[in-house]
């Protein structure tokens, strides 16, 4: 009886379960559980996954002394010191429990993963890139006129229009103002899509110079109006806002159109070979005619050999993945901002990269709260990983398309001059 009521020290030590700390060891806020081997909150766990598992980036210390700490609310302003803290406490990427999401056990998961991996392989040769044997007549394309360019675009009107938009504060109802920045962006996405036709969308059979210019003008307006729903972005200096918008606008309109195409295909409002090119236009891959006279003297066959098949140019693999994932407007807004801000910061660096990193942190925290508000016990790592993997897939596709454009420019195939070429950093 005494032995039962007074167990030995050794047996007690071996049978006592390990208690979970009430405080997150990284930010000292309430802990959610043991993540990556350390007792932490879900926000810090999501930060570790996002930075070191997904992006695997290295960041400089904001203060320069590697001694930054969280504020009284547990918020870190320095990614470097926060990540160092995670590692110092013993967080490791190999502690990720990848078998906890029920989605992993779907019948098609492994086959889908293999397919996505094979599709992301960069072509090893020019022939493999264009998908056919290259012709050898590029040295004598078109009329042979030795001119620098065929068409010149003065983008000043578009920039002036954007400058005006960036000075306007969108009207938000009180019910929207109290929402998070990410939810306000989702509301902004709904606003810029109000002009979208969903039924009986007219088919655009030919894309020429005027159609291209019109697409740029409307695209810049929609990108500017959308991003101005981001409160932290509105607080930036006008010059900083313009620099960021000029770099990300074209990327935004491509991704937004890709997601709209996925949504309309899922609703059976357009065919598998159709792409929603504009709010009032759709194109068909089989019947679309490209007017080349304004940008090249090459033949249609030669131009298409560089840009590749239209389904690849319009990112069919990402459209299919979005149809399967069915992201909400909040998730889609996060995905758009994550890719736009990441590529913009990576391209421009310096002060702009610091700004885009800070903006991404704001939205990442908002996404975390959004998922918890839907279900505080949900494991949202699957959906977040899928969203970010789509962004990585887009960057891979972007690099492949840019290889074709680079080769075409080397051979002087495309002859268009822009007054502000920096506006097409990610135009492919």
UniProtKB/Swiss-Prot annotation:
Q: What positions does the domain NR LBD occupy? A: 181-427
Chief localization class?
A: nucleus
Q: Which PROSITE patterns match?
A: NR_LBD, NUCLEAR_REC_DBD_1, NUCLEAR_REC_DBD_2
Q: Which domain of life is it from?
A: Eukaryota
Q: InterPro entries per the record?
A: C.elegans_Orphan_NR, HNF4-like_DBD, NHR-like_dom_sf, Nucl_hrmn_rcpt_lig-bd, Znf_hrmn_rcpt, Znf_NHR/GATA
Residues annotated as signal peptide: none
Q: Name one GO cellular component term.
A: nucleus
For this UniProt record, give its keywords in alphabetical order, as a comma-separated list.
DNA-binding, Metal-binding, Nucleus, Receptor, Transcription, Transcription regulation, Zinc, Zinc-finger
Q: Which GO terms describe its molecular function?
A: DNA-binding transcription factor activity; RNA polymerase II cis-regulatory region sequence-specific DNA binding; zinc ion binding
The keyword DNA-binding is assigned to this record: yes
According to the UniProt record, which residues make up the DNA-binding region?
Answer: 21-98
Q: Give residue ranges of zinc fingers (NR C4-type).
A: 24-44, 61-86
Q: Where in the cell is it found?
A: Nucleus
| PANTHER family, per the entry | NUCLEAR HORMONE RECEPTOR FAMILY (PTHR45680), NUCLEAR HORMONE RECEPTOR FAMILY-RELATED (PTHR45680:SF6)
Q: Which family does it belong to?
A: Belongs to the nuclear hormone receptor family.
State the function annotated in the UniProt record: Orphan nuclear receptor.
What name appears for this protein in its UniProt entry?
Nuclear hormone receptor family member nhr-44
Organism of origin is Caenorhabditis elegans
